[in-house]
Design a protein with these regions (language model features):
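Gly/Ser/Thr-rich loops at beta-strand to alpha-helix junctions
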Residues: 10, 72-74, 138-141, 231
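Phosphate-bearing ligand-interacting subdomains
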Residues: 53-58, 62-84
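Short glycine-aspartate micro-motif
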Residues: 2-6, 67, 131-135, 224
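Short glycine-rich, Thr/Ser-proximal phosphate-binding strand/loop in the N-terminal lobe
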Residues: 2-56, 150-175, 181-184
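A short helix->loop->beta-strand "cap" motif at the edges of active sites that frequently abuts
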Residues: 87-90, 221
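Phosphate/pyrophosphate-binding loops at sites that engage ATP/ADP/AMP, CoA/4′-phosphopantetheine
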Residues: 49-65, 210-221
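Phosphate-binding/catalytic loop of phosphoryl-transfer enzymes
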Residues: 81, 89-93, 98-170, 199-210, ...
């Protein structure tokens, strides 16, 4: 099997896939989601792997390839060492510039996050291009894939959760609230006023950005959302056509189809 790992700023997602043909797509057989911890040791990663695989009744010996997207580089070396110890193969670190599935037509391709590139690969392969990929994570990102399949660029805004945390931290009387939509956009108390501003505010942001980007990409651009909070926004707008929670993992999986079932792949420099 293939193990795909998406190391994000807030959460790390892992998925196990059965390898298929070069054009194959398949949902992960098992996924996990854990909090991203800075400065984990190889032993700590190893304990995590052992616990997850044991509970899922999957043998680590079945893992023949590991591919990683990481936006937390300080963990890369220890993570690679843990993969070598647990799965006896060196992981391949996916980046926007070491793949040939997505042409990157930005001014500085090396600055494109590996997670955005992997999500764009999966979204355009699954749903076609042009595509706008909206990721609701630590940041809210809008990635633009042109009609010919090239990645043109993105817009980046503060994420929903960090916006809430910043608002509460900088105000004396505003409480933490459940992230859910109130019945009315006009809040009748502090809690519903906050919920309206947060949920419907981000819905409005999403709709507005999609309108602007469709003017440049084409009105037929598909809208694909991912990230832990995508469902919350998607429930309150009609512009999001597809929600795929495992989009980055699926992009890594598709990328891995072109790799050998490898021992001795390249780890971080």
């Amino acid at each position: 099997v293939l193990l795909a790992i998406d190391v994000g700023n807030t959460e790390t997602k892992l998925g196990v896939f059965a390898r298929k043909g070069n054009d194959g797509f398949g949902e992960p057989a098992r996924t996990w989601r854990v909090t991203t911890e800075r400065r984990c040791t190889a032993d700590e990663f190893g304990v995590l792997f052992a616990a997850m695989f044991h509970r899922a009744q999957i043998s680590p010996a079945d893992v023949r390839s590991v591919v990683i997207s990481s936006v937390v580089p300080q963990n890369d070396r220890e993570l690679a060492q843990a993969c070598e110890q647990c799965f006896h193969c060196s992981p391949h670190f996916f980046t926007a510039t070491n793949q040939n599935l997505l042409a990157v037509r930005t001014e500085r391709p090396k600055e494109l996050g590996s997670d955005l590139a992997a999500a764009a690969i999966a979204a355009s392969a699954l749903y076609g291009a042009p595509t706008i990929v909206v990721s609701f994570g630590t940041a809210t990102t809008f990635g633009a894939v042109a009609r010919d399949g090239a990645f043109l660029g993105a817009a980046i805004a503060p994420g929903i959760q960090i916006s809430i945390e910043a608002l509460v931290a900088r105000t004396a009387k505003l409480p933490h609230v459940a992230l859910e939509a109130p019945e009315s956009s006009i809040g009748v108390d502090t809690v519903t006023a906050l919920q309206s501003g947060i949920v419907y505010g981000f819905v409005g942001q999403t709709e507005g950005m999609i309108v602007r980007m469709r003017r440049e990409l084409g009105e037929d651009a598909k809208i694909v959302a991912t990230g832990g909070l995508a469902d919350i926004v998607a429930r309150h707008t009609t512009v999001i056509e597809h929600v795929e929670p495992h989009l980055v993992l699926l992009g890594l999986y598709r990328y891995a189809q072109g790799l050998p079932v490898a021992e001795n792949q390249t780890g971080p420099a």
